[in-house]
């Protein structure tokens, strides 16, 4: 990892937790050592964004797990970047595979959300990744490049974007891409950014890995030159998240 890219660890709590156990988790995180060269962001369920921001130490940022593409309006059940900021969160996760494949969000919609969130001043954790049948068909590169292009077309300022590569077959399955598989895709993504955006953006943009990251797998993954951190699901609700935060130490 280039010295200019600050290690980034995101915890996606998904639709889990209640105030009691999340409060206990937050107490653990607040007591944890967060290295100065590591950025940590937690994404609670929408109902708990305010709660998390009030309880978490300021050294840990808060993200929403999703947002809509406009500021206000008749969009029942949606939240806007402006509302997210109003609750004290500074990041949003967009394009997560569960949004794509469970809720049917298209590349186009995700691109529009990215553009709006950035225009409103939020940082964006933009997720991409292939399904198992796509990997087995040998089209991983094609799929992730197409997804990345739609995101890139909607980004003016890359300093507020973290790209999260999440092979869908490795999310919540206990299967992790090998460090070599992760590095190979991350390296190709950086090459795509260099060819299609700029060398400067390719060098400075953090590309993080998501997909069954645990305290046991994180150190070897973090040692890969193009793996700049993690987006962690299940393990982010457990004390081992602290080990993942310290994967580079």
Swiss-Prot record:
It catalyses: D-glyceraldehyde 3-phosphate = dihydroxyacetone phosphate; dihydroxyacetone phosphate = methylglyoxal + phosphate. Keywords: Acetylation, Cytoplasm, Gluconeogenesis, Glycolysis, Isomerase, Isopeptide bond, Lyase, Methylation, Nitration, Phosphoprotein, Ubl conjugation. There is a cross-link at residue 142 (Glycyl lysine isopeptide (Lys-Gly) (interchain with G-Cter in SUMO1)). Belongs to the triosephosphate isomerase family. It is found in: Cytoplasm. This is Triosephosphate isomerase. InterPro entries: Aldolase_TIM, TIM_sf, TrioseP_Isoase_bac/euk, Triosephosphate_isomerase, Triosephosphate_isomerase_AS. Substrate binds at residues 12, 14. PROSITE patterns: TIM_1, TIM_2. The modification N6-acetyllysine is found at residues 14, 156, 194, 238.
């Amino acid at each position: 990892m280039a010295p200019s890219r600050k290690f980034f660890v995101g915890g996606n709590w998904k639709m889990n937790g209640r105030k009691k156990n999340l409060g206990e988790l937050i107490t653990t995180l607040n007591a944890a050592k967060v290295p100065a060269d590591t950025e940590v962001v937690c994404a609670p369920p929408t109902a708990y964004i305010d709660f998390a921001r009030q309880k978490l130490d300021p050294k840990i940022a808060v993200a929403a797990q999703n947002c809509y593409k406009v500021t206000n309006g008749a969009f029942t059940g949606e939240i806007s970047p402006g509302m997210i900021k109003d609750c004290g969160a500074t990041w949003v996760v967009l394009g997560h595979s569960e949004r794509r494949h469970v809720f049917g969000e298209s590349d186009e919609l995700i691109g529009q959300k990215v553009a709006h969130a950035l225009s409103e001043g939020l940082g964006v954790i933009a997720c991409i990744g292939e399904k198992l049948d796509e990997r087995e068909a040998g089209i991983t590169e094609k799929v992730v490049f197409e997804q990345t292009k739609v995101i890139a077309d909607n980004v003016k300022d890359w300093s507020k974007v973290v790209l999260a590569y999440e092979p869908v077959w490795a999310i919540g399955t206990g299967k992790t891409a090998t460090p070599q598989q992760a590095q190979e895709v991350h390296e190709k993504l950086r090459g795509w950014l260099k060819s299609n955006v700029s060398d400067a953006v390719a060098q400075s943009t953090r590309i993080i890995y998501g997909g069954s990251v645990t305290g046991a797998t994180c150190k070897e993954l973090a040692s890969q030159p193009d793996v700049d951190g993690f987006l962690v699901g299940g393990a982010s609700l457990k004390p081992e998240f602290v080990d993942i935060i310290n994967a580079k130490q």
